[in-house]
Amino acid sequence: NVAVIGNNRPKALPVSEIDFSRLSENNPKICTYEAKWVTDSPVYLKTPPVCPADISRELEQELFSIAVKAYNALGCRDYARIDMRMGEDGIPKVLEVNPNPDISQNAGFARSAAADGLDYSRLILEIVRMAHNRYQDSEQ
């Protein structure tokens, strides 16, 4: 997935991925409820997030471009997360645009921001600042 932040010039943050390589062949390569939320489950423990993702610079730039285009096309503002999956044809597919992803301190969005050098306090302040500026602009 790619976290995106900003309004006039949205910025893609480092790509994050879930590593499914430790799952058995019987487990689907999807982030199930158990894999996402049940912290002591074997599936959770075998699907660690990797951020930044270990991908080529070329693929990273392609994912950034797709994410920002999706963000703009759907009228997102302030922040959002774009979930993607690589197709068997090697082409990234957008699965979901989440305009209100989890931004808690241990969530993926904050992890991507931290990988970009934006600590949690600054991330939250930036989101609040953008929303405040939008509100002020709408009052004029």
Can you name each region flagged by the protein language model?
Residues 1-62, 86-93:
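Phosphate-binding site of ATP-dependent enzymes
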